[in-house]
Amino acid sequence: MIGIVLVLASLLSVGGQLCQKQATRPLTTGGRRRHLMLWLGLALICMGAAMVLWLLVLQTLPVGIAYPMLSLNFVWVTLAAWKIWHEQVPPRHWLGVALIISGIIILGSAA
């Protein structure tokens, strides 16, 4: 159960980061202020919810085990940037993502 909460905290944190990125995107039409407020508001909600879930995780797991699992954020952000904004991800970056996933598996199996 706590593993699900940890993954959800990670996803919400990443969601907040992605909302911040979306808030900075240029608009072709008017409504810049509304666009900015919407995405920043969503970012705050996501980050706040992530913090609450993170506190629940820390009540259960040692921080030395829980914190490295937040490395998943790098994986989620890379995938989202690649899929949503069609950002180029060089092979070296994908190798880094694979190494992060490997590290998470190793650390997770030691818990």
Swiss-Prot record:
Which terms are listed as keywords in the entry?
A: Cell inner membrane, Cell membrane, Lipid A biosynthesis, Lipid biosynthesis, Lipid metabolism, Lipopolysaccharide biosynthesis, Membrane, Transmembrane, Transmembrane helix, Transport
The cross-references to InterPro entries, in alphabetical order and at most eight, read: EamA_dom, Flippase_ArnE, Small_drug/metabolite_transptr
Query: In which pathway is this protein known to take part?
Result: Bacterial outer membrane biogenesis; lipopolysaccharide biosynthesis
Q: What range(s) does the EamA domain occupy?
A: 40-109
State where the protein is found: Cell inner membrane
A GO CC annotation given for this chain: plasma membrane
Q: How does it sit in the membrane?
A: Multi-pass membrane protein
| Stated family | Belongs to the ArnE family.
* Name of the molecule in the record: Probable 4-amino-4-deoxy-L-arabinose-phosphoundecaprenol flippase subunit ArnE
Q: Which organism is it from?
A: Salmonella heidelberg (strain SL476)
Q: What is the lineage of its organism?
A: Bacteria, Pseudomonadati, Pseudomonadota, Gammaproteobacteria, Enterobacterales
Which gene specifies this protein's sequence? arnE
